[in-house]
Amino acid sequence: MNRRNKIIIILVIVIIVGIVAVIANSFLSTPTLTLGDKNILVLAVDKNEQSGGGLDMAFMVELDNGTIANYTPVYPGGMTHPTKHALGGLSGPMMLHDCLWDGPEQGMEYAKEIVEYNTGMHADAVVIIYDDGLDAIIDSIRPLKVDGVVTNLSSVDIVRQNDNYAGYAGRDSGITGNMSRGDAVLVLVKALSEASKDPIKKDTMTKVAIEEYSKGNIVMSPSGSFIKLMATKGFESLS
């Protein structure tokens, strides 16, 4: 996967932490996530990388009585399933990166098992967002106002303006930002959050999210609550 797509995956997963704040509320009427500490495993997937998509980044989002309390990055590199062999003719144990080979439903279960085996963190629900899905949501509310200034820059370029990340192979020496990659991404997240306060943009984001869910670019387990949630609450908890 090329550098641009890897940055997109980083953007996807951090923004999805905010979207999960909305999604999580949809489970509050069910007994499994209503009370106590619960976890949602959020998977960022490059849909066209391989069969089923390549899982490039994940976060475990921790809920405290339905409110996001924390999130923990889960880096797929080196994480394997305790008992399953690799799918698709690959050799060795099943890797977290490749667990979606046979499709999202089975893949989400494999992802839960792999993450729990390797980290001890149990997931009560799983959300997949493919890069196509979040790209569409981001693009639907351009131009963004970043730090009070309207910009038509791409999400990747917004991050590049602010970060000082020099560790990626091939990165040129023209580093102009003074932030960590995480903080630079949060600049974009804040911009999207502010955009969602505009009722028209919020409605647009909600509509696109529902469309992307219908296209299969956002997948949830347990399923069935996303459309109802987005139709009623939209992206309010991002604000």
Model-derived segments and spans:
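Non-catalytic, solvent-exposed segments at the cell envelope interface
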Residues: 2-13, 18-239
